[in-house]
Amino acid sequence: MLEQGESVPAVTLTDADGVDFALDVYQGKPLVVYFYPKADTPGCTNQAKDFTALADDFAAAGVPIVGISKDKPAKLKKFADKYGLRVILASDESGAACEAFGTWVEKSLYGRKYMGIERATFLIGADGAILRVWPKVKVKGHAAEVLEAVQGL
């Protein structure tokens, strides 16, 4: 997994409307990027809703929020519309961003091993360097913790 001080890799993602973009479009301002396993599942829904509840505070700090999963753009669009989400949802169908950030990892459930996205959040500085990493995120209270870090910039 990428660590504090490392540069954000050049990756192309697709937003919920099917438009391709690169994270470097946000260069020049801080950015929060969070990786989550799957849209419209309980933990991922709560996480997106928590960031949405604080969206005005992040916006006041001038910090966009991008949530990344391997879901198709159409699924992300339905997810955003269903819950009124106010974060940028991005599709990484190829897994290139997950690989580059180091969030595509071996997981284990009831003794069965499989590959999946580790829930993680990255606070990225205006210069494109990672300022802070939250690996293995527990959803409850996480968005508020990230906001506190953002407000401390």
What role is predicted for each listed range?
Residues 1-153:
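Chalcogenol-based redox active-site neighborhoods
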